[in-house]
Swiss-Prot record:
InterPro entries per the UniProt record, alphabetical: AflR (IPR013700), Stress_Response_Reg (IPR051711), Zn2-C6_fun-type_DNA-bd_sf (IPR036864), Zn2Cys6_DnaBD (IPR001138)
Taxon lineage: Eukaryota, Fungi, Dikarya, Ascomycota, Pezizomycotina
Keywords carried by this UniProt record: DNA-binding, Metal-binding, Nucleus, Transcription, Transcription regulation, Zinc
Gene source species: Byssochlamys spectabilis
Superkingdom classification of source: Eukaryota
Official protein name in the record: Transcriptional regulator VdtR
Length: 436
């Protein structure tokens, strides 16, 4: 017999090259050189694979309790353990079902694998009059068969649900129990509640009743949120309203700010009817009185309360600058006629005598200067309460905002008062010169 031309067994190589395996990187498994070794100009070598057959754990999984002779076609020498706490007849009956006859101890491992698995043993109280042909029984039908008490699986699971659990349903018609339980929402109410965004839900907490002016200015449409009336009480001898012990200062300060925005409603501007000087001065005076009362309130304040209160003061100061026709030159938009508020100046009259425009402007400036000086005390109290101590019952993240607002109000108010005093001094000098 000639052995010429006979090739030996093919050597199995590793799937990844030695260099990629050592560096723990993915190998393209190209032979004779992988892509990584070819790009790096390095020698690529595939060593011999040391794996023979399946891994030991995968090969011996599930066979730890079986004699090795079984793998070679032998018989199982290890006896099956009897079922715990069950009579011998029940154990024997559990292994006598199937298509190929009873289970025996001399069966080979291949015969065991070819036989259908018996159903799980249900104990001695299980019904013994069950069908012997379990291979033809559907598994889903088996688990939904009625047990010894005549209950299905769903009925048995319902007994495990506590009585306190209630499932809320939303039928098309109104339920009778909704009258007894008003907390249950109908389907339409639930859909409306679910359609609200997080922004609207958060804004609804602090939005005032008269927030329509703000929303009209910002969005040009109706108010997004309508809140119930804020409970308030009137001080004796005072025209401004002060909130009670059950009030919400944040909502009250939002209402106060909304009144200033309602002075210049978009509907009035479109029709060409701007607010008069008297309307603006009255709105500013009422807003500062309410702001002073809210600032002196001893209740716990929300983190956004100082911000809204500072914006209110800045808004009042802006309206005063409109009245005296004074704008900040540092703001570029202030010089644009379409980007600033406009009012309708009305001459001042004493009975039948009407003052001229120059004298009316001087008297209006005197009145505004008096209110601005009174506003200085408000700004000073604001700075002492919210800007002096950054760790005084407030989050540290908002302290810079409070101090920025306080510095802005002090600077802008001081510059406005100084310019207005210079204007009045020049008017007095010119008026005295004309008289002399």
């Amino acid at each position: 017999m000639s052995w010429q031309g006979h090739e030996g067994p093919k050597v199995k190589l590793r799937s990844a090259c030695d260099r990629c395996s050592a560096n723990k990187v993915k190998c393209t498994q190209e032979k004779p050189e992988c892509e990584r070794c070819r790009l790096l100009s390095l020698p690529c070598n595939y060593s011999r694979s040391m794996r023979i057959g399946k891994p030991p754990k995968s090969r011996q999984r599930g066979l730890s309790n079986i004699d090795p002779k079984t793998l070679m076609g032998g018989t199982v020498t290890k006896k099956l353990r009897p079922c715990p706490s069950a009579p011998e007849s029940a154990c024997r009956g559990s292994f006598e079902d199937g298509d190929g006859g009873p289970w025996t101890e001399t069966m080979t491992f291949e015969e065991m694998l070819s036989r259908p698995s018996p159903p799980p043993f249900a104990g001695p109280s299980h019904n013994s009059n069950r069908p012997t042909n379990m291979a033809s029984t559907n598994q889903d039908q088996y688990y939904h068969d009625k047990g010894k008490h005549g209950e299905t699986m769903d009925e048995m699971l319902q007994t495990l649900v506590p009585d306190s659990v209630q499932f809320i349903e939303f039928p098309n018609t109104a339920r009778e129990d909704q009258k007894q339980h008003p907390e249950l929402r109908s389907e339409e109410e639930y859909s409306d509640y679910r359609s609200k965004s997080l922004f609207e839900e958060g804004l609804a907490r602090i939005a005032p009743d008269c927030a329509g002016g703000i929303m009209d200015v910002l969005y040009g449409e109706e108010a997004l949120v309508q809140m119930p009336n804020l409970p308030s009480s009137t001080h004796e001898g005072s025209s401004n309203t002060h909130v009670t012990s059950s009030h919400n200062c944040t909502r009250a300060v939002m209402e106060n700010l909304a009144k200033l925005y309602q002075v210049c409603a978009p509907a009035g501007v479109e029709n060409g009817s701007h607010p008069t000087t008297d309307q603006v001065l009255k709105a500013n005076s009422d807003a500062m009185k309410d702001a002073a009362d809210l600032l002196a309130c001893p209740c716990a304040k929300d983190f956004c309360f100082p911000i809204i209160l500072g914006i209110t003061a800045c808004r009042v100061l802006a309206w005063y600058q409109v009245v005296i026709d004074m704008y900040d030159p540092e703001i570029p938009m202030a010089t644009m006629p379409t980007a600033r508020e406009d009012i309708k100046h009305c001459p001042i009259a004493f009975g039948a005598y009407q003052l001229d425009e120059e004298v009316s402007q001087a008297m209006t400036s005197q009145f505004v200067l008096r209110n601005l000086r009174a506003m200085t005390r408000f700004v000073k109290t604001y700075v002492e309460n919210f800007c002096s101590d950054i760790n005084k019952n407030r989050p540290g993240s908002c302290s810079l905002i409070y101090r920025s607002l306080g510095t802005f109000m002090q600077t802008r108010l001081g510059n406005t008062i100084e310019q207005l005093e210079d204007r009045l001094a020049a008017f007095d000098g010119e008026y005295t010169k004309n008289i002399g």
